């Protein structure tokens, strides 16, 4: 049995080695590339990309699906805020209730349809504090993001989202011991430079509904989001836990932990959303009437540059339900990608959603009143992000190759030890 197992591992490693031969010829053998024509290098480069996509077709199809869901989630989150941005607490808690019902129902169906042994083994493990920590971090992220989105325009929103990449890289390097290749840093640097150039151009434009303070609030949400992703990484890698169970329990905790973040609405310097506790019950009542009955309450002394946004509650429930649907799909796909692949894959996919969101704002049937006119700057930004992502992915491929070689050397050493022990016997 040992010989058969070693033979299978050797065959698998040989297959993986074939996958990286083209990469070696392009990256490692620099002198050979220098002697080839530019056309040959470009042809070889695209051949590597083709082989990469062929060998990971499932990953890329899943990534495209997740990308589409992410874009729709962010677009309808913004449309929901445009309709009832004065009632962020109401939309957040109502969304939590919907998620509780959906995830608990899905997990109940899973328990009934799965084998008893699988469910018994999983239910014996207690992840109480992990669930609480993830839910607390997610609740903080949702609340802070909702606050930031109230005065963050579509283009700025999509560009700020890309800052999650260096933030994730830093936290995973410091706390999870991730080690990156030079190409990972280069890819992230290209993306950051693209962001800097875009922000420089946009800073000369007049954007009345954009607020630097709220941009910074939205950026601060990345800290809690990164810690939440790290906790999920530890739970998925060290413990085998069902995705439905994770989301069902986390959203249940999140319904209560989000109440702990409630005092943020009472911070005086947040003038646009400042709401004393004495007005909380009135705000909740008006928010529910806006969501379910389409009644506008705040219609005077409101709008761009004013303390309050004007209510636009007609059809708010349709927009809100659509947002909840895509947000639930977003959570499930994100957990699945982290579970089956890695947080690196999740980071790469998250990178592309920025320019994708920007392009989505070109279409009125998606963006609604927040529709934007196409600009050359947006397409240059998309090119910069894609180029940085490709460089980032090449770094991952090189790291994967090193792991394969390390695993092959380890298997060869074990085979030699087994052979020596057999000869001695």
UniProtKB/Swiss-Prot annotation:
Signal peptide, first to last residue: none
Sequence ranges on the Vacuolar membrane side: 78-88, 148-157, 203-210, 271-318, 369-378
Annotated glycan sites: 86
Disulfide bridge positions per record: 290-313, 302-310
A Gene Ontology biological process term: amino acid transport
Membrane-related topology note: Multi-pass membrane protein
GO cellular component: vacuolar membrane
Subcellular location(s) of the protein: Vacuole membrane
Highest rank taxon of the organism: Eukaryota
Transmembrane parts of this sequence: 57-77, 89-109, 127-147, 158-178, 182-202, 211-231, 250-270, 319-339, 348-368, 379-399
An example Gene Ontology molecular-function term: xenobiotic transmembrane transporter activity
Record's keyword terms, sorted: Amino-acid transport, Disulfide bond, Glycoprotein, Membrane, Transmembrane, Transmembrane helix, Transport, Vacuole
Residues in compartment: Cytoplasmic: 1-56, 110-126, 179-181, 232-249, 340-347, 400-425
Function: Nutrient transporter. Involved in maintaining the osmotic homeostasis of the digestive vacuole.
Family: Belongs to the CRT-like transporter family.
PANTHER family found in the cross-reference section: PROTEIN CLT2, CHLOROPLASTIC
Protein name in UniProt: Putative chloroquine resistance transporter
Source organism: Plasmodium berghei
Gene: CRT
């Amino acid at each position: 049995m040992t010989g058969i197992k070693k033979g299978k591992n050797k065959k698998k490693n040989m297959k993986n080695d074939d996958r990286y031969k083209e990469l070696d010829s392009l990256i490692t053998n620099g002198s050979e590339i220098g002697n080839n024509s530019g056309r040959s290098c470009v042809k070889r480069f695209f051949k590597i990309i083709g082989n990469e996509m062929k060998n990971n077709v499932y990953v890329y199809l899943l990534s495209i699906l997740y990308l589409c869901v992410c874009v729709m989630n962010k677009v309808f989150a913004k449309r929901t805020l445009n309709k009832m941005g004065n009632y962020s607490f109401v939309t957040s808690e109502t969304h939590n209730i919907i998620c509780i019902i959906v995830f608990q129902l899905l997990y109940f169906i899973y328990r009934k349809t799965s084998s008893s042994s699988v469910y018994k083994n999983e239910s014996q493990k207690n992840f109480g504090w992990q669930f609480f920590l993830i839910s607390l971090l997610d609740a903080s992220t949702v609340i802070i993001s909702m606050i930031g989105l109230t005065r963050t325009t579509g283009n700025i929103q999509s560009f700020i989202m890309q800052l999650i990449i260096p933030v994730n890289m830093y936290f995973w390097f410091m706390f999870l011991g991730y080690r990156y290749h030079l190409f990972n840093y280069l890819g992230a640097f290209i993306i950051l430079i693209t962001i800097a150039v875009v922000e420089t151009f946009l800073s000369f434009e007049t954007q009345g509904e954009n607020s630097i303070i709220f941009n910074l609030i939205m950026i601060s949400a990345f800290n809690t989001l990164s810690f939440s992703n790290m906790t999920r990484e530890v739970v998925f890698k060290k413990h085998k836990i069902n995705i439905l169970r994770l989301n069902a329990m986390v959203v249940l905790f999140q319904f209560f932990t989000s109440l702990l973040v409630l005092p943020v609405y009472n911070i005086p310097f947040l003038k646009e959303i400042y709401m004393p506790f004495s007005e909380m019950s009135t705000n909740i009542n008006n928010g529910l009437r806006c969501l379910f009955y389409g009644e506008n309450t705040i219609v005077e002394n409101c709008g761009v540059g004013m303390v309050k946004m004007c209510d636009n509650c007609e059809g708010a429930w349709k927009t809100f339900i659509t947002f909840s649907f895509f947000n639930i799909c977003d959570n499930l796909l994100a957990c699945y990608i982290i579970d089956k692949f890695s947080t690196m894959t999740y980071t790469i996919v998250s990178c592309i959603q920025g320019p994708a969101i920007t392009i989505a704002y070109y279409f009125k049937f998606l963006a609604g009143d927040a529709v934007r006119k196409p600009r050359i700057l947006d397409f240059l930004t998309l090119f910069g992000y894609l180029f940085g992502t490709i460089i980032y992915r090449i770094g991952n491929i090189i790291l994967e190759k090193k792991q394969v070689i390390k695993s092959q050397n380890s298997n060869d050493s074990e085979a030699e030890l087994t052979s020596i022990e057999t000869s001695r016997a």
